[in-house]
């Protein structure tokens, strides 16, 4: 899946980045992408993920690749430190976006489960199996 491709590439880049705040943030990014992959395993085309896979993650990977090149040049100056701080902030932002996407997808699942349960309860009551073992139909 697209998510697995990005997890693999981000991990690959992360292994060569010694900056702890960046690596910690990227570990979280990969964990969140794994959760997202699990949630979307059996779902077809989800518009919430289109921007993530078509825009956000490609830009993040591109920024990480450029950062790695700068880091490998061993020239650590104010511009580098400013760029590094911006990258850290961006990783925090993308992780928050991933959490929001995961949360909204779980909300959809909860609504679907509740709708299924409600429908099943109505059908059971209609067919004469209406006694509620928990006493909430009183």
Regions found by a protein language model. Give the residues of each.
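Long amphipathic all-alpha helical oligomerization modules
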Residues: 38-138
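Membrane-proximal, non-transmembrane interface segments of integral membrane proteins
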Residues: 1-42, 46
């Amino acid at each position: 899946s697209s998510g697995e491709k990005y997890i693999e590439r981000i991990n690959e880049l992360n292994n060569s980045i010694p900056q702890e705040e960046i690596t910690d943030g990227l570990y979280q990014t990969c964990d969140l992408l794994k959760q997202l992959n699990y949630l979307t395993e059996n779902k077809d085309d989800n518009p919430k993920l289109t921007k993530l896979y078509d825009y956000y993650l490609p830009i993040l990977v591109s920024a990480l690749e450029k950062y790695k090149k700068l880091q490998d040049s061993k020239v650590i100056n104010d511009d580098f430190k400013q760029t590094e701080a911006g990258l850290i902030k961006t990783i925090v932002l993308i992780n928050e976006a991933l959490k929001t996407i995961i949360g909204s997808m779980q909300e959809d699942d909860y609504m679907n489960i509740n709708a299924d349960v409600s429908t099943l309860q109505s059908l059971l009551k209609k067919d004469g199996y209406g006694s509620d073992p928990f006493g909430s139909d009183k």
